[in-house]
């Protein structure tokens, strides 16, 4: 399986997509993210037999942003029964911007899925109810999954997001008005923004999410993080909802479950085989990494891998 991968292959893919740098836009509504140099470019693969391949700036850490929504949902799945989660947040694509209030108002405060901001805030609200120290618990989980004890939050990014949190606060208060929010809004926002401000590199992310390619189990230690059913559910949500309102196009072009963040990172899963992560800070119109999507499309074509 892993014989199709090599560092040379990944370097060649980055060489082909590098001319796209300059055609997208770095996220600027969070000032700390706007300062990230646009020419960063990286890719990394982790196979279920433990091999790592990488190229470019794969050891440079960045703010994972909405990629963290997979981790918060994973944590919630270990603390709640299935029906408890899905009665508060849906499983459908939204077709709306990730921070939309309109759909939330029409649907009486129940977010479409856990990967839009409203849905992720519900998940964080649920974690706030069950964990005494949700920020510390997330660090423990991520450090263990990635095998890196020094992974931490970028306090500058978290602070910058909190200072520009008006829309997310409005989303939370709207859900609270419909009775779908239990805890103090500011406390939940603090947790949510810290999760978004996790700093990881592509290699760490590829290793971190290998449990989604391995029926919910880590490799090496073989620790069962989720049941095979739960891992399947997250992969399905990534395929249908993971790339904002560009999820359909991403499935069409690349054919892998994926989750992006406005920091320019994307993580993808091919169940039973591997995880792949890319990073390029410039985004397309849907808020997904422009060069990153192109690199994933090239990879899918070159190695003939997708879930279809």
UniProtKB/Swiss-Prot annotation:
Which chemical reaction does it catalyze? Answer: L-glutamine + H2O = L-glutamate + NH4(+)
Q: What class of enzyme is it?
A: hydrolase
EC number assigned by the record: 3.5.1.2
Q: Which InterPro entries does the UniProt entry name for this protein?
A: Beta-lactam/transpept-like (IPR012338), Glutaminase (IPR015868)
Q: Name one GO molecular function term.
A: glutaminase activity
User: Entry's HAMAP family?
Assistant: Glutaminase
> Per the similarity annotation, which family is this?
Belongs to the glutaminase family.
Q: Subunit composition?
A: Homotetramer.
The protein here is known as: Glutaminase
Organism from which the protein derives: Photorhabdus laumondii subsp. laumondii (strain DSM 15139 / CIP 105565 / TT01)
Q: Which gene encodes it?
A: glsA
């Amino acid at each position: 399986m892993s014989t199709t991968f090599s560092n040379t292959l990944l370097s060649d893919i980055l060489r082909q997509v590098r001319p796209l740098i300059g055609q997208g836009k770095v996220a600027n509504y969070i000032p700390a993210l706007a300062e990230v140099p646009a020419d960063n470019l990286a890719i990394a693969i982790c196979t279920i037999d433990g091999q790592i391949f990488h190229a470019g700036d794969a050891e440079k850490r960045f703010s994972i942003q909405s990629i963290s929504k997979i981790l918060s949902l994973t944590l919630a799945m270990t603390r709640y029964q299935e029906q408890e989660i899905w009665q508060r947040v849906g499983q459908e694509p939204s077709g709306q911007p990730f921070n939309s209030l309109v759909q939330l108002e029409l649907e009486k405060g129940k977010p479409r899925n856990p990967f839009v901001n409203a849905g992720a805030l519900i998940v964080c609200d649920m974690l706030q109810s069950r964990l005494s120290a949700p920020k510390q618990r997330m660090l423990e989980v991520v450090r263990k999954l990635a095998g890196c004890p020094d992974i931490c939050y970028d306090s500058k990014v978290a602070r910058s997001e909190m200072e520009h949190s008006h829309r997310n606060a409005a989303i939370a208060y709207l859900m609270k008005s419909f009775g779908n929010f239990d805890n103090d809004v500011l406390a939940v926002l603090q947790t949510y923004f810290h999760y978004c401000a996790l700093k990881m590199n592509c290699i760490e992310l590829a290793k971190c999410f290998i449990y989604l390619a391995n029926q919910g189990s880590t490799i090496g230690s073989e620790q069962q993080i989720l049941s095979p059913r739960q891992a399947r559910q997250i992969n399905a949500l990534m395929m249908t909802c993971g790339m904002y309102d560009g999820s359909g196009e991403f499935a069409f072009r690349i054919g892998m479950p994926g989750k992006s963040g406005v920091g320019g990172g994307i993580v993808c899963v091919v169940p039973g085989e591997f995880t792949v992560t890319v990073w390029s800070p410039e985004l397309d119109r849907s808020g997904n990494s422009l060069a990153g999507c192109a690199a994933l499309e090239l990879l899918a074509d070159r190695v003939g891998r997708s879930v279809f």
